[in-house]
Amino acid sequence: MNSDSVENLFISRISKDDPEAIFQIVEVVGSGSFGTVCACRWMKKKDRESNGNRLIACKFVEVNADDVETNLNLVKEIDILKESMDCPYIVEYKGCYLKSSMLLIVMEYCKGGSLLDIIELCGKRLIEEEIAAVCAGVVKGLVYLHSKRTTHRDIKAGNVLLDEEGLPKLADFGVSTIAEQGQKMNTVIGSPYWMAPEIIMGQGYDQKADIWSLGITAIEIAELVPPRFDVPPSRVIFTIPHQPPPSLKIPSDWSPEFNDFVKQCLSMNPALRPSAQQLLSHPFILKGSSQQILQKLVNESIPLLKEKRAEKIRQLEEQEQQRNSSGSKMVSSVPTRASQALTNVRNAESLKGSVVILNSNTKTASIMRNKNPQPPPPSHSSGAGGAAGSTRRVPGNKSVLNRYPPANNVSNGTIAPSPINNNNNNNNTTTKVGKVSSPFLQQQQQQQQQNNNKNPPPKPTTPSPNKKIGDNISKTTPTTPTTTQPNTSTTTKTGSSLNIKPTNNVNRSTISIGQQKSPLQSSEREASYDEESVSVIYHGSEDEEDEEEFNHEDYEEINVNI
């Protein structure tokens, strides 16, 4: 299979979306050997409004012309997603695009993450009513899939997502398949701990294999790990067909309905297992008819997910450092998947702030990065001695107040940002940030007020057009000489806040947005101090009149490899 046939294979499956859809990469939400999933926001106001101001998810997958099996699995995944767009219990498909050898699969973004995220990253232990609601959503999704003769073949907590309203949705159809009526499948595929015994034995199987995986998933959610998790995957596939089916470890901790549900799903004989349609009337599934309890769970989990994902990346980095320093033999227990995932995350991190242009007419994608990105802030202490300075505009619902030296080139009430050195030609543009109430700025203002009380400045006899007002936003001044910059914005001081009006020449920089301590889509502007990147991050809803515009001249197309 050559590259042209690969291109034709995916292009024929492109969805008929808007001729040109533009969104911006906001956050890395998942990564593995398959590639990386990023959360993205629409840049155009009309697109944001038509999509309910919701983020979307973009899955980046590297395609290789020689890897025929992987390409065919991707094709099946796209076909199944396209055919399932009218089922609310399956993640919604938005489109598929090609960028060189990079395949972009665009789907709805489930803000609550996966069940695995919730029980593993957030440390949540679900109560029985929550487990019943999750299983009810999975069963309804399976009813739809099985009616289309589709077998998922990889049901597990990591592939069950929750949207913002707490609705469970099936995802990751990479190993799913569509069979002819009455046809048995023979391919041994899936995740070992969740695989049905008939799959392992090679006896031929049908959609009842998903019912077994559902029973294992129910135990996984209840007990945080699947049965036999202490057995290596290479050995567990030999024990599953030859041992009695698993059950809940402490049956008395759960209702008779839950115990019976697990027992029926985990019948060794697939003919004795109920179908997904039959499970809809099971008392345990009927107990999970309300999704409100899951919405409460999602609301509690969302603030923790960003922090825990960043922590997981740090752990991968530590494992990689340990591998490099100790040698491969000393740390052979570190899986190679972790190394690949870390590489994927690093590559995806570099795409934050980049703009993705999806064109359904040409059936291609373009990934654009700013031609003149701003340099990272200079290294400062995280104490109060750091200097605050110019604010720069970043695409996305964020404004970042970087700790650059304070602005000191002022004329006619205008602040001109100071460069880091005389050779710096970056366009440090300012923007409107509204009322600033961060403890960081308040501390600086209080310290400045104390200094003024001790040493009151002399009252000027005549107004000077070059009067320095940089001390209004910083307690220190730069020691290096600066070059006078042209006026770029108009600033007025209102109480303890700065109202900086944006200019037309906006520098859309690609920067690291750091670790955000609260949800991205907040109803109010909030501030959080990130000691690692030494910056104050503001995020929240943009003003009604604030409309993102994309200027192609400010960007250049890049190749990506995630």
UniProtKB/Swiss-Prot annotation:
E.C. no: 2.7.11.1
Keywords: ATP-binding, Kinase, Magnesium, Metal-binding, Nucleotide-binding, Serine/threonine-protein kinase, Transferase
GO biological process: intracellular signal transduction; negative regulation of canonical Wnt signaling pathway; positive regulation of apoptotic process; programmed cell death; protein phosphorylation; regulation of MAPK cascade; signal transduction
Annotated region (Disordered), positions in chain: 316-339, 366-562
Required cofactor names: Mg(2+)
Catalytic activity: L-seryl-[protein] + ATP = O-phospho-L-seryl-[protein] + ADP + H(+); L-threonyl-[protein] + ATP = O-phospho-L-threonyl-[protein] + ADP + H(+)
Record SMART domains: S_TKc (SM00220)
Record: residues binding ATP: 29-37, 59
Positions with biased composition (Polar residues): 322-339, 495-522
Top-rank EC class of the record's enzyme: transferase
Record-annotated Protein kinase domain positions: 23-285
Low complexity bias (residue ranges): 421-431, 442-454, 476-494
Record Gene3D superfamilies: Transferase(Phosphotransferase) domain 1
One Gene Ontology MF term: protein serine kinase activity
Gene Ontology CC entries for this record: cytoplasm; nucleus
Active site: 154
Database matches in PANTHER family: STERILE20-LIKE KINASE, ISOFORM B, STERILE20-LIKE KINASE, ISOFORM B-RELATED
Name under which the protein is recorded: Serine/threonine-protein kinase dst3
Origin species: Dictyostelium discoideum (Social amoeba)
Upper classification of the organism: Eukaryota, Amoebozoa, Evosea, Eumycetozoa, Dictyostelia
Gene that this sequence comes from: dst3
